[in-house]
A protein has these predicted regions:
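Surface-exposed acidic, glycine-flexible loop patches that form ligand/cofactor-binding
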Residues: 53-62, 94-100, 179-183
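Conserved SGNH/GDSL esterase-like catalytic core that processes O-acyl groups on lipids
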Residues: 1-87, 113-123, 159
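A beta-strand-loop signature enriched in Asp, Gly, Thr, and Trp
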Residues: 75-96, 100-107
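Extracellular serine-dependent O-acyl
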Residues: 104-109, 117-155, 164-183
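Loop/turn elements at helix/coil->beta-strand transitions in domains of secreted/extracellular proteins
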Residues: 11-16, 62-65, 100-105, 136-141
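Solvent-exposed, polar/charged alpha-helical surfaces in well-ordered, non-transmembrane soluble domains
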Residues: 5, 9, 87-94, 98, ...
Length: 183
């Protein structure tokens, strides 16, 4: 019951999920302000997180769309660096584009943040979208999930509950159907 799996099933799409609790785009949960060596972009090329010499073969799977939900862990605790956050989004966009030249890339803001912290990751994502479009890449987007209010319960350590995952999937399904023209 994760929103990526529910979304893929509903859209009859293949999916690959790269996820780990606490991982960030530049700084893992409660990590140093200067970032972590094992944040997702730095280990994205691995088949297994803890094994450096077994690399993922990006040529074997070219998705139509790549959804990126990172940033919550980076800004969930103080201190974090907004400039490093922005640079990490930009650099990860370039990595994704180099691996998946034809895919649409959608940066997601998840359900856990509100206020300034949410605004900081949205600003960073918007900067990537703006820069990409200025350079002619019109296949980069931002989509915001609605905020988790608690009325659907919580999973472990404030992660989304099963019901929140279903809500997130419903939002993403509708968005991707429109974006990808999948009806």
């Amino acid at each position: 019951y994760t929103y990526p799996a529910l979304t893929a099933r509903a859209l009859k799409a293949q999916h690959v999920v790269v996820a780990r609790s606490g991982i960030g785009i530049y700084r893992n949960y409660n990590g140093p302000k200067t970032g972590n060596a094992d944040c997702l972009p730095r280990i994205y090329d691995r088949t297994l997180f803890g094994v450096e010499d077994v690399k993922w073969d990006f040529a074997q799977y070219q998705p139509d769309v790549v959804c990126v939900n990172l940033g919550t862990n980076d800004v969930s605790t103080d201190p974090y660096d907004k400039t490093m956050l922005e640079n990490a989004y930009r650099d990860f966009y370039y990595t994704l584009r180099s691996k998946y030249p034809e895919a649409k890339i959608v940066f997601l803001s998840g359900c856990a943040l509100v206020g300034n912290r949410l605004e900081h990751i949205q600003y960073a994502m918007d900067g990537v979208v703006r820069q990409a479009r200025l350079k002619g890449d019109t296949n980069v987007y931002r989509f915001d999930m609605s905020h988790q209010t608690g009325d659907l319960g919580y999973g472990a350590k404030w992660h989304p509950s099963k019901w929140q995952q279903e809500k997130m999937a419903g939002e993403l399904i509708a968005y991707l159907r429109g974006l990808m023209k999948w009806f």
